């Protein structure tokens, strides 16, 4: 696991990099009660300046720079959220889903605006 400069991890966060690496980029924050986990072949990469809201589950996915993951969202293996994107609260991003830069993603990853 790598936590880069000025990144913050808040209370009751679980970070499990037992299967593959986890990288948390500079100035990113992972808020209370979130879970970061990997699977074999599915590392977790959080870019720079990312906000991971309260009670978020990130599982073997990629969150690119300057993105925000809303409270209680789940993002599964091999999903990719590109730069400057927002995932709305309580969203589910299923395995392998990819979204372009500057996306607003809400719900069950069926709606892309």
Residue ranges and their predicted role:
Residues 1-8, 12-14:
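Extended, small-residue-rich solenoid/repeat segments and analogous flexible loops
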């Amino acid at each position: 696991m790598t936590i880069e400069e000025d990144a913050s991890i808040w209370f009751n966060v679980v970070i499990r990099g037992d299967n593959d690496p986890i990288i948390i980029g500079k100035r990113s924050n992972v808020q209370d009660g979130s879970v970061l986990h990997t699977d074999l072949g599915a590392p977790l990469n959080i870019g720079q300046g990312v906000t991971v809201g309260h009670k978020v589950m990130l599982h073997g996915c990629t969150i690119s720079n300057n993105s925000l993951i809303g409270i209680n969202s789940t993002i599964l293996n091999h999903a990719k959220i590109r730069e400057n994107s927002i995932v709305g609260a309580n969203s589910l991003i299923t395995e392998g889903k990819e979204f372009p830069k500057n996306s607003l993603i809400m719900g069950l990853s069926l709606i892309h605006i």
